[in-house]
Amino acid sequence: MTEKDTDGADGLTKAKSNAVSEDYETVNHVTGLKLAVIVTGLCLSVLLVALDNTIIATAIPKITDQFHALEDIGWYGSSYLLTICAFQLIFGKIYTFFPVKWVFLIAITIFEIGSAICGAAPNSTALIIGRAVAGIGSAGIFSGALIIIAYSIPLEKRPAYTGAIGGMYGIASVAGPLMGGAFTDHISWRWCFYINLPIGAVTILSILIFLKHPKQKLDNNQTWKARLLKLDPIGTAFFMPSIICLLLALQWGGTKYPWNNGRIIALFVVFAVLISGFIYFQIRGGDSATVPPRILKKRSIASGAFFLFTIGSAFFIMVYYLPIWFQAIKGASATSSGIMNIPMVLSLVVLSIASGITVTAIGYYAPLYYVSTVLTSIGAGLLTTFTTETSKGKWIGYQIIFGAGVGTGLQLSIIAAQAVLPLEDVAVGTVIMMFCQTLGGALFVSVGQNVFTNLLVKGVVNAAPGLDPQVVLRVGATQLKNMIPPQFLDGVQVAYNDALTKTWYVATALAALSVIGSVGMEWKSVKGKKIEPAAA
């Protein structure tokens, strides 16, 4: 590995680059039927995670009817997101210092236990606990699937498989409410969780049997205590409660408590103090930090994380609030509104796979960032033009444009991280990207909820004077035509349409802001070359 024609710093840099190249060459690359089984198992694991993000949405009315716990509605979703966000970054360190295969299998097992608790929950508290447990497992599944891809497939072929996994994530995210409605209407809401058990079992078996232990740089002479200390316990002690405080403030602010309430202010203050402590210890911690500064300083990592934060946030706003438009304005049932989302699903999946194949063919991923930003921004902007009379052709066409934009860009940041980082840093880089996507979705779905609720209340006061806005909020979108007096219905639908389209302004702004990440991305090729670490 010594370079005879160089010395000093240049020689050291070149030697490090060669070492990185050898890391990629000595990975246990998988081919043939074994690869097909592993990738299928990984896609199913991502299906589990993405489904659980949204499948409960259409089941909540039946759950609250059974448990008589209307006040717990917010916790059914937020308990899952809280533990995902709190544990996602720490999984990056765990995947770095412990065997990838076993960490992934443990994450799926935790998720399965949480799903079983949810399915068998005798009361609302048990359901919330089950959701939190499932969230812990979920925090390590999606990133783990991408890390296994990195260890199993050569870099130049990896984008196509990453695109397939991204497509599966998109399918499940949008199809979740549809499946939740179908299970709730025709079987039981409990099957929203029981369905995870056989799917997870298939994933566990496929990985357990067919995946060999990837060749990681693990120091097997280290004690478990020494490895645990490398997980940055001090940083984690600051990070986890900071994220919980932030998400609780956004969950409760403007709904359970007014924004100027002491509890909300205190949560934001505690978040600011704790996250400042976390940042301080990350800077001091160097390579031992949960988020090593040298990784975050790489242009492609910072730009890719920002891009995924904005595009992911825009996507989740549409996933949550577009079905409400179909229910409130078009009178669709929960199941039918999911079917009406199919144009977005199909375009997202097709473009996600196509963009992965394109990167594999041409080698460069940076140009597709611009395509994603443009299409997503145009699609989101067109969706904000909806009225109560919007035709079928428009709501289908606009969804296709938006879905195509999101599908093109959803997996690009993962590809970028794997292209610019040495293999031993891929786990942390991948988790940083996934964390930004998850956190963005959690934050801006809450922001969207506050924007929507406040505008709907004002809209009902103006468009349907004489009707109590709180009645409209309690009724829900699917029951408007049955529960709202006929003389108020047109005004309420106008108020709903106005509140939803203005909520989508947030998604449009986020999609437009993603251009910052696109412009900052380095032009690196994944084709026909050995991968060297990017300059910090």
Curated annotation (Swiss-Prot):
- Regions crossing the membrane: 30-50, 80-100, 102-122, 133-153, 163-183, 191-211, 234-254, 264-284, 306-326, 342-362, 366-386, 400-420, 426-446, 503-523
Question: Carries keyword Glycoprotein?
Answer: yes
What role does it play? MFS-type efflux pump involved in the modulation susceptibility to azoles, including fluconazole, itraconazole, miconazole and voriconazole. Also confers increased resistance chloramphenicol and thiamphenicol, suggesting that it acts as a pleiotropic drug transporter with a broad substrate spectrum. Finally, increases the tolerance to cycloheximide when expressed in S.cerevisiae, but not in dermatophyte species.
What keywords were assigned to this record? Cell membrane, Glycoprotein, Membrane, Transmembrane, Transmembrane helix, Transport
Bilayer topology: Multi-pass membrane protein
Q: Which Gene3D superfamilies match?
A: MFS general substrate transporter like domains, Multidrug resistance protein D
Task: Return the protein name.
Answer: MFS-type efflux pump MFS1
Tell me which species this is from.
Arthroderma benhamiae (strain ATCC MYA-4681 / CBS 112371) (Trichophyton mentagrophytes)
Without the gene, what phenotype results? Leads to decreased tolerance to the azoles fluconazole, itraconazole, voriconaole, miconazole, as well as to the antibiotics chloramphenicol and thiamphenicol.
Upper classification of the source organism reads:
Eukaryota, Fungi, Dikarya, Ascomycota, Pezizomycotina
- Give the record's glycosylation annotations as residue positions: N123, N221
Q: Which GO terms describe its molecular function?
A: transmembrane transporter activity
A Pfam entry, by short name: MFS_1
Q: Which domain of life is it from?
A: Eukaryota
Q: Where in the cell is it found?
A: Cell membrane
CDD domains with a match to the protein in the record = MFS_Azr1_MDR_like
